[in-house]
Amino acid sequence: MDLAFELRKAMETGKVVLGSNETIRLAKTGGAKLIIVAKNAPKEIKDDIYYYAKLSDIPVYEFEGTSVELGTLLGKPFVVASLAIVDPGESKILAIAKR
């Protein structure tokens, strides 16, 4: 699966929330179907995301690139340390959670 293609498709046809604060909030409330975290995200943020995602039974995928690369992949002119997939739309992005 082409992660870049599926992420962009999810952004166009579904609902994707960017940012660590919003991702942690959605992990706490169980409002996400998948969370993606950049490999170089700050440890405190990663720890919070993994902790709350586990409590809410939300899969977390660690993106192999940096937050700069994740932001670029999404077509954003800023870094993205984490994001939450609320609605995948027409994408098959949730398949990466099964790996």
Curated annotation (Swiss-Prot):
Q: Which domain of life is it from?
A: Archaea
Q: Which Pfam families match?
A: Ribosomal_L7Ae
Q: Which residues form the signal peptide?
A: none
Q: One GO molecular function term?
A: RNA binding
This protein's GO CC annotations = cytosolic large ribosomal subunit
GO biological process per UniProt: translation
Instruction: Give the matching InterPro entries.
Output: Ribosomal_eL30, Ribosomal_eL30-like, Ribosomal_eL30-like_sf, Ribosomal_eL30_CS, Ribosomal_eL8/eL30/eS12/Gad45
Q: Which family does it belong to?
A: Belongs to the eukaryotic ribosomal protein eL30 family.
HAMAP family, A to Z: Ribosomal_eL30
Q: How does it assemble?
A: Part of the 50S ribosomal subunit.
PANTHER family the record matches: RIBOSOMAL PROTEIN L30 (PTHR11449)
Q: What is this protein called?
A: Large ribosomal subunit protein eL30
Q: Which organism is it from?
A: Pyrococcus furiosus (strain ATCC 43587 / DSM 3638 / JCM 8422 / Vc1)
UniProt lineage? Archaea, Methanobacteriati, Methanobacteriota, Thermococci, Thermococcales
Gene name? rpl30e
